[in-house]
């Protein structure tokens, strides 16, 4: 089994408990991070009528937050799609949001027309994409000119110190144990800190975005550097 297939199968296995684990392990902060990202994009992008796709959508958390943010910011979502390669995750998403279109596909091969989207989001998923540069090129392809890409991700820390040490201790020692109890799959939650350590720094990822045809509009770090928000415009 190839690396990408193993990652997808891991998410299939933890899908039934994924939402519960996320809320507990992040102390609910992941919802706040997503809301801030969606509202920031809505404030930057002036169009009122929007076509949105959420990539690596998982169980659909961002779908709901996009809908709530559009209502709050007086925007109109013409179409919103959730795309994920995990059938387990999509099964949960479809139960939660029966009126939303969900598509089984990987980020590196999107079944979407070129220049068909205003906004594309991917939350805590880009580090799980093996062919990351290919995925970023796909994001550029399906976005309209001046369309917005928003990425939420756990990036490799660039600084040391007490807070960084606490973060590392939690990720490597506490999170896998709690996640394992909730999901009965400890190895899946041991993968999380390893995948963060194997990912890019903020500067490295911004360079990849530029190389894929994007211009950075905004960056923000949440919760002492635990989570990063990247907002970029397609050139």
From Swiss-Prot:
Keywords: Menaquinone biosynthesis, Methyltransferase, S-adenosyl-L-methionine, Transferase, Ubiquinone biosynthesis. Its EC number is 2.1.1.163, 2.1.1.201. It holds the Pfam family Ubie_methyltran. One of its GO terms (biological process) is menaquinone biosynthetic process. GO terms for molecular function: 2-methoxy-6-polyprenyl-1,4-benzoquinol methyltransferase activity; demethylmenaquinone methyltransferase activity. It is an enzyme of class 2 (transferase). S-adenosyl-L-methionine binds at residues 59, 84, 123. It catalyses: a 2-demethylmenaquinol + S-adenosyl-L-methionine = a menaquinol + S-adenosyl-L-homocysteine + H(+); a 2-methoxy-6-(all-trans-polyprenyl)benzene-1,4-diol + S-adenosyl-L-methionine = a 5-methoxy-2-methyl-3-(all-trans-polyprenyl)benzene-1,4-diol + S-adenosyl-L-homocysteine + H(+). Pathway: Quinol/quinone metabolism; menaquinone biosynthesis; menaquinol from 1,4-dihydroxy-2-naphthoate: step 2/2; Cofactor biosynthesis; ubiquinone biosynthesis. Belongs to the class I-like SAM-binding methyltransferase superfamily. MenG/UbiE family. NCBIfam families: MenG_MenH_UbiE (TIGR01934), PRK00216.1-5 (NF001244). Methyltransferase required for the conversion of demethylmenaquinol (DMKH2) to menaquinol (MKH2) and the conversion of 2-polyprenyl-6-methoxy-1,4-benzoquinol (DDMQH2) to 2-polyprenyl-3-methyl-6-methoxy-1,4-benzoquinol (DMQH2). HAMAP family: MenG_UbiE_methyltr (MF_01813). PANTHER family: 2-METHOXY-6-POLYPRENYL-1,4-BENZOQUINOL METHYLASE, MITOCHONDRIAL, METHYLTRANSFERASE. This is Ubiquinone/menaquinone biosynthesis C-methyltransferase UbiE. The gene is ubiE.
């Amino acid at each position: 089994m190839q690396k990408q297939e193993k990652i997808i199968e891991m998410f299939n296995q933890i899908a039934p408990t994924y939402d519960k684990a996320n809320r507990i392990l992040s102390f609910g902060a992941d919802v706040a991070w997503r809301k801030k990202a969606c509202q920031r994009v809505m404030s930057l992008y002036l169009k009122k009528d929007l076509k949105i796709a959420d990539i690596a959508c998982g169980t659909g958390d961002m779908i709901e937050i996009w809908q709530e943010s559009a209502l709050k910011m007086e925007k109109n979502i013409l179409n919103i799609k959730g795309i994920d390669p995990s059938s387990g995750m999509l099964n949960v998403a479809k139960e939660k949001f029966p009126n939303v279109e969900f598509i089984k596909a990987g980020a590196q091969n999107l079944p979407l027309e070129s220049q068909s989207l205003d906004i594309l989001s991917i939350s805590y998923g880009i580090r799980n994409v093996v062919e990351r540069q290919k995925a970023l090129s796909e994001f550029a392809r399906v976005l309209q000119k001046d369309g917005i890409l928003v990425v939420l991700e756990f990036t490799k820390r660039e600084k040391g110190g007490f807070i960084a040490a606490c973060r590392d201790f939690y990720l490597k020692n506490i999170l896998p144990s709690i996640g394992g109890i909730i999901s009965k799959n400890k190895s899946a939650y041991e993968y999380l800190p390893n995948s963060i350590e194997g990912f890019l720094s903020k500067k490295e990822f911004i360079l990849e975005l530029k190389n894929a045809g994007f211009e950075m509009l905004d960056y923000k770090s949440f919760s002492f550097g635990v989570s990063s928000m990247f907002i970029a415009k397609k050139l």
